[in-house]
Amino acid sequence: MKSAVILLPGLNRDRDMIAALTKITGQAPVTVWQTDTSIPDDVDLILIPGGFSYGDYLRCGAIAARMPVMQAVREKADKGVMVMGVCNGFQILLEAGLLPGALMRNASLKFVCREVKLEVTNANTSFTRGYKPGQIIRCPVAHHDGNYFADAETLKRLEGEGQVVFRYAEGTNPNGSVNDIAGIVNARGNVLGMMPHPENLIEAAHGGDDGRALFAGALGITA
């Protein structure tokens, strides 16, 4: 299974993402730049890492979402290719219209960098099939604008159709996200956006491997 990592000016978690994928799959992902208009046909998983694309000017992810490469990402997603955006990558997916809702400034108005606990609220997706329903996993967060919001109708649909796949466990919501939402998928289930950083917990020697199953599930391999 082959993966691709999207590179944009200002992202700073691309090396972490590349290292995680290389360790899990045994091969380095291909890298695709912001001005590229296509993604290799044999790619099974596209990842948009975290950071501060284009300095977070206008809104987080707003400029990145309008780069040529995102049209290529959109075309792949429409064909069923797995797409995953983490932190700024999640913000970009929202700005690109690939996922519903918005990410606002943290309720504390402060940058938050710490470990949180996540509840797996839907283990019946390709991304989360390596977990058990209700399982609590550890994951670090590092963001200033991670407060997820959506209107009542959108929230009802997300909750009712099982599109909320990760929720901050009780008492650990770091940003004020509505319904403690930490990660969602699209209706088809092949596009995931989440604020926490699973790529930073894939080796026991580095503090834990709770994030490993997420990548393995998306690629259809054994964790």
UniProtKB/Swiss-Prot annotation:
It comes from the Bacteria. Keywords: ATP-binding, Cytoplasm, Glutamine amidotransferase, Hydrolase, Ligase, Nucleotide-binding, Purine biosynthesis. The gene is purQ. Transmembrane segments: none annotated. InterPro entries: Class_I_gatase-like, PRibForGlyAmidine_synth_PurQ. Its main location: cytoplasm. One of its GO terms (molecular function) is phosphoribosylformylglycinamidine synthase activity. This is Phosphoribosylformylglycinamidine synthase subunit PurQ. It comes from Brucella suis biovar 1 (strain 1330).
